[in-house]
Regions:
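Cytosolic catalytic headpiece
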Residues: 5-112, 116-122, 154-157, 174
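Membrane-embedded alpha-helical bundles of multi-pass transporters
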Residues: 1, 32, 56, 76, ...
Length: 198
């Protein structure tokens, strides 16, 4: 399963994420096999632990009842959660975190997530989500593996670091070599000159 990042702006924003709002149904959980209750997706807890290690605080939102949301949040290792929320509540939660100066990612897969996805600094959609969610999203994770979320953040951080490193060395090279190639040493009495072809 791959990661699709829409553009360079999304790549830059993704590396700065410090807070993440996740939708429970469909994003964190699988449909109930026996109709009795949802289960966490495979590797959900592992993904949450990786995100915590990266310094990212998670907030789980759900329209479900308190007891069920609390149980799944604790099972996943998420200490911030809200229950019986409406789509507007998710949007308000993202806005409130942004007003605190946080860089917020929203992870969702449904129509009721689209408003919060549009507001977030970075919007992440699961590849099996609705067309609306994937249209709004800046990052799309192909498949249901939640470990792709920390992978996407690591990818963005490494890519931006490599771009900055390359720009630094290109600047140093040009600052030194262009004056040499232009004959600056010759102007100060040196009788050697580097050919511009070098």
């Amino acid at each position: 399963a791959g990661i699709l990042i829409k553009d360079a702006t999304a790549l830059e924003l993704l590396r700065n994420v410090d807070s993440m709002v996740v939708d429970k149904t469909g994003t964190m959980t699988l449909p109930p096999p026996d109709g009795q209750g949802e289960q966490l997706k495979p590797f959900a807890r592992e993904a949450v632990e990786e995100l915590h290690k990266m310094g990212i605080t998670l907030y789980m939102m759900s329209g479900d009842k308190e007891e069920r949301v609390r149980h799944l949040a604790q099972e996943a290792g998420i200490s911030h959660y809200k229950w019986q929320v409406l789509p507007q509540d998710k949007d308000d939660a993202v806005k409130a975190l942004q007003q605190e100066g946080r860089h917020v990612a929203m992870v969702g897969d449904g129509i009721n997530d689209s408003q919060a996805l549009a507001r977030a600094d970075v919007s992440i959609a699961m590849g099996r989500g609705t067309d609306v969610a994937m249209d709004v999203a800046q990052v799309t994770l192909m498949g249901d593996d939640l470990r792709r979320i920390p992978d996407a953040i690591r990818l963005s951080r490494r890519t931006v670091a490599m771009i900055r490193q390359n720009l630094f060395w290109a600047f140093i090279y040009n600052m030194v070599c262009i004056p040499l190639a232009a004959g600056l040493p010759y102007a100060f009495g040196a009788h050697w000159q580097i050919t511009p072809m070098w």
